[in-house]
Design a protein with these regions (language model features):
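Membrane-interface capping segments at transmembrane-helix boundaries
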Residues: 157, 252-258, 428-430, 523-537
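Alpha-helical transmembrane segments of integral membrane proteins
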Residues: 249-282, 536-541
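Short, Lys/Arg-rich, polar N-terminal cytosolic tail immediately upstream
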Residues: 1-13
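Glycine/proline-centered hinge or cleavage motifs at structural transition points of membrane proteins
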Residues: 166-167, 180, 439-441, 453
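Juxtamembrane inter-helical linkers in multi-pass membrane proteins
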Residues: 169, 259-271, 307-321
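Membrane-water interface segments at the C-terminal ends of transmembrane alpha-helices
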Residues: 11-45, 54-153, 181-208, 234-250, ...
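Glycine-rich helix-loop "coupling/hinge" segments at transmembrane-helix boundaries
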Residues: 201-227, 306-309, 474-504, 537-541
Length: 542
């Protein structure tokens, strides 16, 4: 039975103020940095900012980024749509594994994906536009497969059958009937893929060349190399406006899609014809190969030298003489990343959990929960630059405290925590709270009786998800990190900037560890989510 919001009279006083802590956190670490960034644009250096906006260089980079993002989106759709059709509609042995594999690229840190493709393709494909597009399409396969597949799975195929009966070819039925019914999902997934590709940083830095740049990489160059903060602010402003426009256009296009009544159906058996059956199974097998090939190449690179198999790269992880004397040992980077992930998980779980709880309480809490989703539309470079301008210089310089990175990571993870926790609270039968209150329980005890069990599970799951986000985040950490305490993604990038196979091997070993840590946290989220789904409902136990 669906959840119902507790009545206002049954809500304990403290629960009515759960929105205050998330509002304060978002105000200080999201609104304030963005405001500082805006003030920088409009301040005395505004002339420099206006000059940057009017310069041809910023629009040349924008054109390159748009072209790259459009091409990446087209390739992701080209590969992702057949996979969405197969894993969401047909029943076959290994389907669950295929569906899980499709998700793997999306949860991998972008730095790991870039290194995996360098290990897989070597010098066969030169660094530049093509390699960046392939990597972006790989990362975003799950976006297309999940979003489009969820809608495709609900179509029975009756309309297509009617079209075939009337003489339409299989391709014609797909173009005239199936595609229009999937338009909203395709547009939504395309908008997300475009934004991710347009604002990419790690993949562009590792796989791109001087002709392959994004506004994100341009902001990094302006702040760390040119020390041109007004120019970086102008670039961040352009990126923020373009991303907002794309998401808005995607939402508008989705709403304008023709509505069609659909009949939810279960998985269908494989096609009876030999050729269609082989096509479905071949698509699933090809998808598995596409996903596993880069990861396998990364694993091989961690145990392979130019002429033999070796474990030297793994043995070098704890040594400061593995080409990283100036930067510290790779194992120290692992400790740093784990510490940041733990702090991120704690802060994001508390802030996001309180914001999600505020959703079920009538009042202004729902506005705060809506505000908590805003960081999804702010790029890492914009967030990192704003945070650096707000808290990275006197009179409030927090760089030496080591708190800027976990706070920025928590800000990025809060929307995901809300997305995990809020549905769980909504699905809880709120009448149990009223029953407990009627039996004499204190309002706080009544709330914990009704929502405590599910809240405990979803908070743990969302904390693990926030930790996974922190482990792989590269953009904000690049702006806010200290040279003496790099995270694992930053350490990987620095290793790859050094010549020699030892640096590449150690980077590959470090990337494998990062993959394992990330997947463990994702599996924790999945296990907790499965456990919550198996819990009996209140109505069922009554």
């Amino acid at each position: 039975m669906g959840g119902s919001a507790p009545t206002l009279t049954a809500v304990p006083t403290w629960l009515r103020w759960t929105w205050a802590a998330p509002a304060l956190f978002l105000g200080v670490f999201l609104v304030y940095p963005l405001a500082v960034l805006g003030v920088t644009v409009m301040s005395d250096s505004g002339t420099s900012v206006v000059s940057a906006l009017l310069s041809t260089s910023i629009w040349q980079v924008t054109a390159l980024a748009v072209t790259q993002a459009l091409t990446s989106t087209a390739l992701a759709l080209l590969v992702g749509l057949p996979l969405a059709n197969v894993v969401s509609r047909y029943r076959f042995r290994g389907r669950a594994v295929a569906q899980a594999l499709v998700t793997v690229p999306f949860v991998l840190p972008t730095v790991v994906v870039a290194l995996a493709f360098r290990s897989l393709l070597g010098s066969g494909v030169p660094q530049g536009f093509v390699l960046v597009v392939i990597a972006h399409a790989y990362v975003n396969l799950a976006v297309v497969a999940r979003i489009v597949g969820a809608q495709w799975a609900q179509h029975s195929g009756d309309y297509e059958s009617v079209a075939r009966t009337l003489g339409a070819t299989r391709w014609r039925a797909f173009v005239d009937v199936t595609l229009p019914s999937l338009r909203s999902a395709i547009v939504a997934s395309a908008a997300v893929v475009f934004v991710f590709s347009f604002s990419s940083l790690g993949i562009v830095l590792l796989l791109g060349d001087p002709s392959t740049r994004t506004l994100e990489s341009q902001i990094l160059r302006q702040t760390s190399v040119l020390l041109d903060f007004p120019g970086a602010a102008a670039t961040a402003l352009v990126q923020l406006v373009l991303i907002s426009c794309v998401l808005l256009l995607g939402a508008m296009a989705s709403r304008r899609s023709p509505a069609r009544r659909i009949r939810p159906v279960g998985l269908r058996p494989l096609p009876s014809g030999r050729v269609p059956r082989i096509a479905v199974l071949a698509t699933a097998a090809l998808g598995a190969v596409i996903v596993l090939a880069p990861v396998t190449a990364l694993l091989v690179a961690s145990v392979r030298s130019s002429d033999s198999w070796t474990l030297n790269w793994w043995a070098s992880l704890g040594s400061v003489d593995a080409g990283t004397t100036r930067l510290g040992s790779p194992s120290a980077a692992i400790v740093t990343s784990l510490a940041y992930a733990a702090m991120t998980a704690l802060v994001a779980a508390v802030v996001g959990g309180l914001a999600a709880v505020a959703v079920i309480v009538p009042g202004r809490g729902r506005i705060v929960a809506l505000l908590a989703v805003v960081p999804l539309g702010v790029s890492a470079a914009t967030l990192g630059l704003g945070t650096l301008l707000a808290f990275g210089r006197p009179p409030l310089d927090l760089r030496a405290t080591g708190l800027l990175i976990p706070l920025a990571h928590a800000l990025v993870a809060v929307p995901l925590v809300v997305a995990v926790v809020a549905p769980g609270l909504r699905s809880t039968d709120g009448r149990l709270m009223s029953v407990a209150a009627t039996l004499g329980a204190h309002p706080s005890r009544a709330f914990l009786t009704a929502y405590g069990p599910v809240l405990r599970v979803v908070i743990l799951g969302s904390a693990a998800l926030a930790g996974a986000v922190s482990l792989g985040e590269f953009g904000a950490a690049t702006f806010l990190g200290r040279a003496s305490s790099p995270t694992v993604p930053i350490q990987i990038v620095r290793l790859l900037g050094r010549p020699g196979e030892q640096s590449l091997g150690v980077a590959a070993a470090l990337a494998v560890i990062l993959v394992v840590m990330t997947l463990v946290l994702v599996l924790v989220v999945d296990r907790l989510g499965t456990g919550r789904m198996r819990q009996p409902s209140v109505a069922a136990t009554a």
